[in-house]
Amino acid sequence: MPIAPCRLFDTRSASAVGARSTPLSAGETYTQKVTGDNGNCSIPPAATAVAMNVTIVNPSATSFLTVYPADAPQPTASNLNWVGNQAATPNKVDVKLSATGEIKLFNNGGTVDVVADIVGYYADHNHDDRYYTKA
């Protein structure tokens, strides 16, 4: 479901949105609640995944960021890759939500601020048999 873009969180202290106002540390995994209302975003509990624009800002070292469901093991793939002191870099990320409506973000090295804007969400579609295709 497309929505008006809304800021889920911003870890920069000068413009903090959400519960955190400090950069992610090297090797840190950060858990973020997605469903509910944070004053900027209102994502329904029925959402199963979200479409986000994730931006890294002020990276201190070459690293990568992985975004994944909070109830899943960390995958080996990354969503953003950068070099130290690189300019702010965005990437679109579609991520499934955990059963509790959460995601995790893993920062491999150095410190980095992260900004996440939600642009849409996915929900299970209830339909009748007119749209059912039998194998």
What are these regions (language model features)?
Residues 1-135:
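Short edge beta-strands and adjacent beta->alpha junctions
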